[in-house]
Structure formats: structure tokens, C-alpha cells
């Protein structure tokens, strides 16, 4: 903490002000470094489920490496819900929307946009979310 008096004991408001600003900037930088936005991972699931699940894991890991918290519902919900049962799929889609509402951004991976992905993209647009597009190799499309 900055002291109002210098090392020799004299009143030094300028020095105090400078050190106070430096400390404030250091606290802000530390807080910013600790912040990790939540991002919704949008990628194919149906079709080649095994390959698409592995890709979703890679995309989630990529988000972590980019200092984000990934939300990848098609990895999580498929552990206890059956995508082939229409009622369960509808419930899962609803839960996807709930999770998406907590996210700062939607990250879309790959060149093939499935029907489910398009629904997620459309919803993100309606909610004015930032949408970022990436290749399967995790390079951002500009």
C-alpha cells in the first residue's frame, strides 16, 4: 500500500498518487488475467458420432487454451439423454438454450453446418451474441 510519506519521512502526495495508481493498475490487470469468458461450442454431432464427439473435445480443449470456459452440451447431455428419442432431444435442445444464455460468445467449428447448429446460430443472432467461426483445424475465419 502506498504511503503518504516518503522514505525520509516527508509528506509526498505526488509519490503517493503515483504508487496508488500503479497498485490500482496492477489489481485491474490481475483481475483481467483471472477472467475467463464462457463460450458455447457449436459443432456437428449426428452422423459420425464418434468422430464428431472427439472433435468437440478438441474444440473444448482449444477454448480452454484460449483462456475461456467451454460449454459443449452435445458432449455432456448425450451421456444421459438419447438424441434419437424425440422427446429427450427436445428437452436437450431446451437445456442447450438455457446454457447458451449464460455464454458470452458462440464458437462455430467446421465448414458443415447441421440443422441443429443452424438453430443455435440463429438463436445466437437473435440474442445478439458474438459469433466466431473456426475451421476444423481451429483457425479463426475472418
List the predicted regions and their residue ranges:
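Catalytic phosphate/metal-binding cores of nucleic-acid and nucleotide-processing enzymes, i.e., regions
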Residues: 1-142
Amino acid at each position: 500500500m502506498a504511503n503518504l510519506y516518503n522514505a525520509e519521512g516527508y509528506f509526498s502526495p505526488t509519490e503517493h498518487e503515483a504508487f496508488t495508481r500503479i497498485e490500482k493498475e496492477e489489481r485491474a490487470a490481475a483481475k483481467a488475467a483471472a477472467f475467463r469468458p464462457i463460450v458455447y461450442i457449436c459443432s456437428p454431432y449426428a452422423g459420425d458420432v464418434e468422430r464428431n464427439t472427439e472433435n468437440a473435445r478438441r474444440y473444448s480443449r482449444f477454448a480452454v487454451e484460449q483462456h475461456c470456459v467451454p460449454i459443449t452440451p452435445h458432449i455432456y447431455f448425450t451421456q444421459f439423454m438419447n438424441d434419437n428419442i424425440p422427446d429427450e432431444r427436445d428437452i436437450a435442445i431446451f437445456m442447450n438454450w438455457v446454457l447458451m444464455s449464460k455464454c458470452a460468445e458462440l464458437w462455430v467449428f467446421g465448414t458443415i453446418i447441421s440443422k441443429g447448429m443452424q438453430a443455435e446460430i440463429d438463436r445466437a443472432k437473435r440474442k445478439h451474441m458474438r459469433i466466431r467461426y473456426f475451421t476444423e483445424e481451429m483457425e479463426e475465419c475472418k
